[in-house]
Curated annotation (Swiss-Prot):
CDD domains: Bromo_brd8_like (cd05507)
Sections of the chain in a coiled coil: 97-171
GO cellular component terms, semicolon-separated: mitochondrion; NuA4 histone acetyltransferase complex; nucleosome; Swr1 complex
Name of this chain's protein: Bromodomain-containing protein 8
């Protein structure tokens, strides 16, 4: 909302027509799906839904963003409600879509009603006509229908032209440093050539019809207009009307034939900006005094001339021309030149440098001379338009019908069957520009200037210098984004490098700037036309080849554990003390289903390395704790093997993970540390093994201190030992199967290891714990856990892709979804289940989160947006859960040694334990992980509560 005002500034450059409700609904739905930051995707998705007759930039990214900001400003932000169970707060996107959907439904109902009325009316008319009652009015009806049709077509045409004109204007405004999207190349035809002598005589007037044909407001920017210096900018009172009688131009003019013979490409477009350099103007051969050109005064009347003054094309009477003005070439494309207005006002006396003289041919009497145009500097105009084609006869210039051949020192442009020999309309694209530039390269280095073909008597004056000067003055090229491509820019740069040596003064600033800005624009991803999903796609797909490192971690773990299983027995005993009997699966949890197979993402990769890392710093407390747990496990012969099953289970979460979504995981820093820590030296392995082994031997001496816990543990041991044996015997095979009663495969073993840490009491032995007058404490602990897990849920619900997973999927949104996905899951359902008590542990929460993402991955194809959203969001949410479990496990480890010793004095122990935890040594893994997790006290309390619940 805050950025809405900034976005509204975009409206000045975008289309101004109002959006239809249908278009707004498409926009809002696309934003709800792709998010309000991804305008590339939003724009691409709704392009097919534009109403007919819309301009090409209607659904541009800026226009979409601007329109959506308008929608946001006109929509009330929904107030956040608190405390209502299972209700997810509606977002602004939902409100907008709901409102527009209702409006669109009403609109469609209205359309249906109108269509039905029209149908009934037409049916009634048809029945009357068939019955013969309307015979007298048939002609009238036909005329009415024809008139209506004609009016509709005219309206559509006017609307289309207005839309095109507005689109062209926007395209021109988009590139303010450059000129209008018109390329004017003026090439002298008559007396403007420095090396040629032109016969002067009668003036042939031009037809005004030809001059004004096709001139509409939409085509004004691209209409070539001949501008006269010295002519007043306003219409004089006696100016000729548009209907002034004119003689049409003859198509077989010798000038045209001569132009056809000398059809070579125009001089380099790199010279256009030299109009701005006032120092070069005095020496220009363009500034020709009228006194040197004897024109019979009788031919100066009724000549139609088009003058461009701010886009208006008034008609100037020929008699208004002053005989002393200088004919200076000025094209609309050069309107940005600072010296142009001064040139128009300046008289010939201000230019002190002598000008090349243009004399008439002495051998022919002046009476016989065929007149050139009244403009002594008549030019052939090339109009290069990237977008709007102009009529071929859009400008009127008088032609010379002189039979005398004229020398043409400058290369001219081929005329391709154009009615007016002085106007050539060329539709520009990048190929033509590059062809012109190639020919320019050849032309620029010709040493001489073409000689007159016979009839011209005056020699060219210093051919090469004249060519340069003529190029400086004659060519005005405007560069637009549409004309430039990489090839063109390369050609321009090549010409620049070549020209620096020969004509350093001829370098064109505009061309260089155009080339540079084109290159800069193409560095900006927004301006490139190609689809921009691919880099994102590649980044998303980068994590895919990661299972290999995970498998190496697994293998190293297995080797490491085989080498020092006794030490790791105790390490895991420390972690899982007091609750290990829950491995016995005779009473599976009521909430668990087969979907749990994919639910467990082990936090253990981020757990074990800190333990190993800090072995040197806290070996003594741990070894004493190991002794205590050894007592709790009992002293039977197989007692050492049982914990190993838990070790092995925790040691291979990646092997469980890789079949379903292991390819989507990204190694976080802790996992990388895991890999390094498992490559520790053999000496450290042996040392830790001997320390833990010696502690186990000392353990059985304190059996007398144990209470009902050890008895309960020993009661349950035979089953668990058998299970551990079965697991150990198959440890080296690929997917080992545990002999569990509920039929889960080894993939569920990781889940069970998590259940050790945070599931509710479910086995008979653990029910003995709950008898110990802790019902009230368990309820309190459950409340605290619920608050803590809701923090994790809220982090997931605030994810940038969460709006896809917030609500249940309906068959309207995804056809056939419920036939493919047997157990749908979404964030609102998970929240409801937490509040209702259906989810009572972190493992169940993680299971349902995983289920939700796996449903999305299963249903959508791998190239679908929702698929990639699910993969990315799954990775982020699982990181949150892993951090939660990591802190939980470390705190459980630090607490378990004391709680296993004396359960009766647990209250005092817990207080003492809490104070110990608050003073964790700075080198310990618990301290590091608390830093990594933010180290908040509330999170710690929540995890303590989780552990209380399970006891």
């Amino acid at each position: 909302m805050a950025t809405g005002t900034g976005k509204h500034k975009l409206l000045s450059t975008g289309p101004t027509e109002p959006w239809s409700i249908r278009e707004k609904l498409c926009l809002a739905s696309s934003v709800m799906r792709s998010g309000d930051q991804n305008w590339v995707s939003v724009s691409r998705a709704i392009k097919p839904f534009a109403e007919p007759g819309r301009p090409p930039d209607w659904f541009s990214q800026k226009h979409c963003a601007s329109q959506y900001s308008e929608l946001l400003e006109t929509t009330e932000t929904p107030k956040r409600k608190r405390g209502e169970k299972g209700e997810v707060v509606e977002t602004v996107e939902d409100v907008i879509v709901r409102k527009l959907t209702a409006e669109r439904v009403e609109e469609l109902k209205k359309v249906i009603k109108e269509t039905q009325e029209r149908y009934r009316r037409l049916k009634r008319d048809a029945e009357l006509i068939q019955a013969g009652h309307m015979d007298s009015r048939l002609d009238e009806l036909c005329n009415d229908i024809a008139m209506k049709k004609k009016l509709e077509e005219e309206e559509a045409e006017v609307k289309r032209k207005a839309t095109d004109a507005a689109y062209q204007a926007r395209q021109a405004v988009k590139t303010p440093p450059r000129r209008l999207p018109t390329v004017m190349v003026r090439s002298p035809v008559d007396s403007a050539s420095p090396g040629g002598d032109y016969p002067l005589g009668d003036l042939t007037p031009t037809t005004m019809e030809e001059a004004t044909s096709g001139v509409t407001p939409g085509t004004l920017p691209s209409t070539p207009v001949t501008s006269f210096p010295g002519i007043p900018d306003t219409l004089p009172p006696g100016s000729a009307p548009l209907e002034a009688p004119m003689t049409p131009i003859t198509d077989d003019s010798p000038q045209k034939k001569m132009l056809g013979q000398k059809a070579t490409p125009p001089p380099s477009p790199l010279l256009s900006e030299l109009l701005k350099k006032g120092s070069l103007l005095p020496t220009s051969p363009r500034l020709v005094n009228e006194s040197e050109m004897p024109v019979p005064p009788g031919h100066l009347n009724s000549t139609g001339v088009l003058l461009e003054v701010g886009g208006v094309l008034p008609m100037i009477h020929g008699g208004e021309i002053q005989p002393t003005t200088s004919a200076v070439a000025a094209s609309p494309a050069a309107s940005g030149a600072p010296t142009l207005s001064r040139l128009l006002e300046a008289g010939p006396t201000q230019f002190t440098t002598p000008l090349p003289s243009f004399t008439t041919v002495a051998s022919e009497p002046p009476v016989k001379l065929v007149p050139p145009p009244v403009e002594s500097v008549s030019q052939a105009t090339i109009v290069m338009m990237p977008a709007l084609p102009a009529p071929s006869s859009a400008a009127a210039v008088s032609t010379s019908e002189s039979g005398a051949p004229v020398s043409q020192p400058e290369p001219c442009v081929p005329l391709e069957a154009v009615g007016d020999p002085h106007t050539v309309t060329v539709s520009m694209d990048s190929n033509e520009i590059s062809m012109i530039i190639n020919s320019i390269k050849e032309e620029c280095f010709r040493s001489g200037v073409a000689e007159a073909p016979g009839g011209s008597k005056a020699p060219s004056i210093d051919g090469k210098e004249d060519l340069d000067l003529a190029e400086k003055m004659d060519i005005a090229v405007s560069y637009t984004g549409e004309e430039l491509d990489f090839e063109t820019v390369g050609d321009i740069i090549a010409i620049i490098e070549d020209k620096v040596d020969d004509h350093p003064e001829v370098l064109d600033v505009a061309a260089v700037e155009a080339a540079l800005s084109f290159c800069e624009e193409n560095d900006d991803p927004q301006s490139l036309p190609g689809p921009w999903e691919h880099p994102i796609q590649q980044e998303r797909d980068k994590p895919v080849p990661l299972p290999a490192p995970e498998m190496t971690v697994k293998q190293e773990r297995l080797d490491f554990e085989e080498s020092e299983n006794k030490g790791l027995h105790d390490l895991v005993d420390i972690r899982d003390s007091g609750v290990e009997i829950k491995v016995e699966p005779t009473e599976p949890e009521p909430g668990m289903s087969g979907a749990e197979i994919v639910a467990g993402v082990g936090p253990v990769p981020s757990m074990e390395p800190p333990e190993l890392r800090s072995q040197d710093s806290d070996e003594e407390p741990r070894s004493s704790a190991a002794g205590d747990i050894g007592e709790a496990d009992g002293s039977s012969g197989k007692g050492d093997e049982r914990p190993l099953s838990a070790v092995k289970t925790e040691a291979s979460p990646e092997s469980m993970l890789s079949p379903s979504h292991g390819s989507n995981l990204i190694e976080d820093p802790l996992e990388a540390e895991t890999q390094h820590k498992f490559e520790m030296s053999d000496s450290l392995k042996e040392e830790s093994g001997t320390i833990f082994g010696s502690q186990i031997k000392d353990a059985p001496g304190d059996d007398e201190e144990e209470d009902g816990v050890s008895e309960a543990a020993s009661l349950e041991e035979p089953k668990e030992e058998d299970q551990g044996e079965g697991y150990l015997s198959e440890m080296d095979n690929e997917p080992p199967v545990s002999e569990s009663d509920d039929g889960f495969s080894i993939h569920n073993a990781t889940l069970q290891s998590h259940t050790l840490a945070d599931s509710i009491p479910s086995s008979p032995a653990s029910s003995q714990f709950s008898v110990c007058s802790e019902d009230q404490e368990a309820i309190q602990a459950q409340k605290i856990w619920k608050k803590a897990i809701m923090l994790v849920w809220r982090a997931a619900a605030n994810h940038r892709y969460a709006n896809v997973f917030l609500q249940p999927v309906t068959d309207d949104i995804a056809p056939g979804y419920h036939s493919i996905v047997q157990r749908p899951m979404d964030l609102s359902t998970i929240k409801k289940n937490i509040e209702n008590g259906l989810i009572r542990s972190t493992a169940e929460f993680q299971r349902d989160i995983m289920l939700m993402f796996q449903n999305a991955v299963m249903y959508n194809s791998s190239d679908h947006d929702v698929y990639h959203m699910a993969v990315e969001m799954q990775r982020d949410v699982l990181e949150q859960i892993q951090q939660f479990l990591a802190t939980q496990l470390i705190m459980q480890t630090s607490e378990s040694g004391i709680s296993a010793k004396s359960l009766r004095g647990r209250d005092s122990t817990r207080k003492q334990d809490a104070s110990e935890k608050d003073s964790v040594p700075m080198g310990s893994p618990a301290f590091l992980l608390s830093l990594f997790d933010g180290g908040t006290r509330g999170r710690r309390c929540a995890i303590e509560a989780d552990m209380k619940m399970k006891k």
